[in-house]
Amino acid sequence: MRILLPLLILISISSRAQTLRAGEAISLIQHRYAGTPPLNTVDTIKAGDPNTLVTGITTTFLDTMEVLRAAVRRGDNLIITHEPTFYNHLDNTKFFTDDPVYKEKLAFIEQHHLVVFRLHDEIHADTTDHILKGIYEELGWDKYPHPPGPRGQYFVTVPQVTLAELARSLQSKLHVQTLRVEGDPNLSISHVAFLPGSSGLEKQVLALRQPGIEVLIAGEASEWETVEYVRDAVAQGKNKALILLGHQVSEEPGMERCAKDLRELFPGIRVDHIVAGQPLWNPEHGPVANSPQ
């Protein structure tokens, strides 16, 4: 019976694909990523009516205006975003009540009857951090060994390489427009801590403190916190380095992986992944066109 249950669920979902409501779909997605979110989880509906019939699903790192427009063009009305819709972690809109940018974005969502759900805490908190796994797969690092234990997945042993070589490889494979590096370019690297997104000073420093770790790869970090910690560590002769990919670069592959999961979960419903793109550009090369189609 335990083997048949997932199959029966899939058959049920497929048979009622035309009558699946957003709230029901969201509940199934949360069940798929069975992580335990914090009590004050941000994994909630940010806009829209949960009773809306689902016509298609879009996953994305962040539901920018361009992502929302692309979703509408594709006929998708359930948006699964990893990061906030309204510019702050809790999506608190009190400050933006009379803001023209906020008002236009909200009006667009309402006009097109979109439902926006944030999938952040649960997709990270599952036994496997699916956002981390996504970028490991993108880099081909899923084959490399990790230490045992629940936090072991955030540490990986890679073939020996210099810091400069590692940075160039990451920039090339991930098409990073504004990659930043701190540390000795010739530092030998084989033990890596990888914290996608913006995990904050304490988690980043704790990762750097782990025995043998030479470099932390992160999405972003406060320049006056982790960045200065690494600067002092290097000045003290410690073999430490920092690579900042950019928040979107570090987490978009995980949400693309999410889209693959949802295609299996909802076999009768269109599921797209729409890349949010990198918001910042390097004046040496100019902005790269990465707007969603």
Regions found by a protein language model. Give the residues of each.
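Sec/Tat signal peptide C-region and signal peptidase I cleavage site
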Residues: 13-17
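Active-site catalytic microenvironments in core metabolic enzymes, especially phosphate/sugar-handling
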Residues: 18-293
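Sec-dependent N-terminal signal peptides
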Residues: 3-12
